[in-house]
Amino acid sequence: MSKKNFLFTSESVSEGHPDKVADRISDAVVDAFLGADPYARVAVETLVTTNLIVMAGEVRGPASVNAALMDELARHAVKDIGYEQDGFHWKNAEIINRVHSQSADIAQGVDAAGDKDEGAGDQGIMFGYACNETPVLMPAPIYYSHEILKSLAEARHSGAAPQLLPDSKSQVTLEYRDGKPVRATSVVVSHQHVDGLSQADIKEIVRPHVKNVLPEGWMPAEDQFYVNPTGRFVIGGPDGDTGLTGRKIIVDTYGGAAPHGGGAFSGKDPTKVDRSAAYAARYLAKNVVASGLADKCVIQLSYAIGVSKPLSVYVDTSGTCKVDEDKLAVVLQQLVDLSPRGIRTHLGLNKPIYARTAAYGHFGRSPDADGGFSWEKTDLVEQLKKAF
C-alpha cells in the first residue's frame, strides 16, 4: 500500500464462521496438550459440516489427552460459540477422530540432540507487519472489520441481540488520502439470524454496532452500507458451508495489507514456525513502529526443517524508516533469539493460550496476564531507541 490516495478493503469473519469453528476446535486440542505437557507436539486439523466434526492430525504428548477428551473439547467449543441448531448442535453432532502419533522422521529433525540445537519443524517463510494507522498498530480496514464483529458477538452472547446467530462476516473499504485512512466508503455485514426477520430488521440491529466502532463521521452513505445483501441468512455455520482449519489466513493476519507466507496458525503447537515465527515477526515489527523508528514495517523470516537459525531476516519500512534499515535488521536479531526455541522462550509460547486466538485475528489484541498474546507486547521499545 505505497500509493498515497486509494481505496483498500479487508474482511473478517466471526467465531461462528465454519472455518473459525474448525480453528477453535483445533486450538482447543493444542491448549489441552500444552496444558498437560508444555513440550507436547500437536498438528490437528478439523473439518465441520452438517452435524459432523472430523479431527485428524499428528500428536506427541500425554495419554491423558485422549480421543474422549478431544471429543469433549470439540463439543465445548461448539457450545461456547453458540450452535444449538438442527443442522449443527454441540450435543448431538457426530465426531470422527483420526488423530495419531507424530512421525519419528519429523520428530528427529525438530528435537534437540546432544550439542545440536532444536531445529525448525518445517521450511517456510513468515511475515510480520505493523503500522501506525490504529492504536494497536494494525491496518485500519482489518481492525475495524474485526471490531464490528466483536461488538455484534458481545451483543449476541449477552442476550442484547437474541435475534442474531453465530455465523457472520464483515468487510470494510476505507479511503486513504496522503497514505492515511480518512473514511469508510462502504461497509458490508452478513449476519446469520433467526427466522422471521426482514433484511431491514437486521440492518437496524447491526447499524449501531458499525457506527460505534467507526470513528465519528466515517459511516458510509446509506446506499453503501450493505447488511445481508442476499436478503436472508437463516441457514448458516457448518450446516450451510463446510469449514476447515487454516482457511482464513488473511483474516487471521493483516487483511491483505501485508504479505503472507502461506502457513496457517491454528491447530499447531509453537514448535511449528508457521505459527511461532509469524508471531515473532509481528512482535518485532510492532516494536519497530511503537518505538517511532518507522511508520510501517514488514519483516520476513525464513527457515529450513531441522535448522535452528533463520536463513534470512528481511526488513522493509516502505521508505518510512528514520534509521538505517540494514542496521535495524541486525539489531533486531541481537535483541531476540530467532531460533524456534529462542522465540518460544522469549514470548513464553509453551502455554495453553491458543483457543482465544482462533477468532477476530491473532494480531492487534491486548496481551493477557497469563501470557496470551505476548507477541503484542512493546517491551523492546527502549532497547531499540538506545540502539540508535
Swiss-Prot record:
GO terms for biological process: one-carbon metabolic process; S-adenosylmethionine biosynthetic process. One of its GO terms (cellular component) is cytoplasm. One of its GO terms (molecular function) is methionine adenosyltransferase activity. L-methionine binds at residues 58, 102, 241, 272. ATP binds at residues 17, 167-169, 232-233, 241, 247-248, 264, 268. Keywords: ATP-binding, Cytoplasm, Magnesium, Metal-binding, Nucleotide-binding, One-carbon metabolism, Potassium, Transferase. The keyword rRNA-binding does not apply. Its cofactor is Mg(2+); K(+). Pfam families: S-AdoMet_synt_C, S-AdoMet_synt_M, S-AdoMet_synt_N. InterPro entries: ADOMET_SYNTHASE_CS (IPR022631), S-AdoMet_synt_C (IPR022630), S-AdoMet_synt_central (IPR022629), S-AdoMet_synt_N (IPR022628), S-AdoMet_synthetase (IPR002133), S-AdoMet_synthetase_sfam (IPR022636). Belongs to the AdoMet synthase family. This is S-adenosylmethionine synthase. The lineage of its organism: Bacteria, Pseudomonadati, Pseudomonadota, Alphaproteobacteria, Rhodospirillales.
